[in-house]
Amino acid sequence: MAQALPPLPYDYGSLEPHVDATTMNIHHTKHHQTYVNNLNAALDKFPELKDLGLVDLNKAVGTDKLPKDVATVIRNNGGGHYNHSFFWKVMTNPSNTNGPNGDVKAAIEASFGSVDEMKAKFNAAAAGRFGSGWAWLSVKPDGSLSIDSTPNQDNPLMTALPDVAGGIPLLGLDVWEHAYYLKYQNRRPEYIAAWWNVVNWEQVAENYKAAQAGTVPL
């Protein structure tokens, strides 16, 4: 089955003023679409890989399940497709975001001491990622939460890679320049701080519930 660009769960301007509509439009219809196109082109060369879903393709990165001819293409573009599909869902209109509560808040407090401390560590990971990449809040196999950053389009599902800590993602932030440069230019920390205003904590809670059941959210 061919991979497809998912529709956004909101309008391009819904995240204003924190993430601008022009950036969202270009990010979704150009950057994400390119990852989908490149991934499908790679899968066309190896039809047997089409039986793998997007999550399983990402989990296969760094293993011998992927032919060498397309391993890097799938790592970059399969990662890009998963990461962005996940990213769109963990954002929402600023009026709909109220902060974490319930089980996910308790898990954050158990792992980091407080929500504010978690945010501080997450901000540091996002701001400190040299070049392009992502910051992640993930559930580890022991049930604890951790914060990591990955380069380029790598993600916590790619556990076979030597520099990936692994886990099930709950929250992710794109810190590639194309995610923020039109509005924030080189002010990445300002973008990161603004982004918390559009985090969809209800979706994060759903992701946590899925992770507790061993399911990878997408």
Swiss-Prot record:
A Gene Ontology cellular-component term: mitochondrial matrix
Annotated Mn(2+) binding sites: H27, H84, D174, H178
Top-level taxon: Eukaryota
Covalent S-S links between cysteines: none
Keywords: Manganese, Metal-binding, Mitochondrion, Oxidoreductase, Transit peptide
Binding note for cofactor: Binds 1 Mn(2+) ion per subunit.
Record-listed E.C. numbers: 1.15.1.1
The protein's role, per its UniProt record: Destroys superoxide anion radicals which are normally produced within the cells and which are toxic to biological systems.
Listed name of the protein: Superoxide dismutase [Mn], mitochondrial
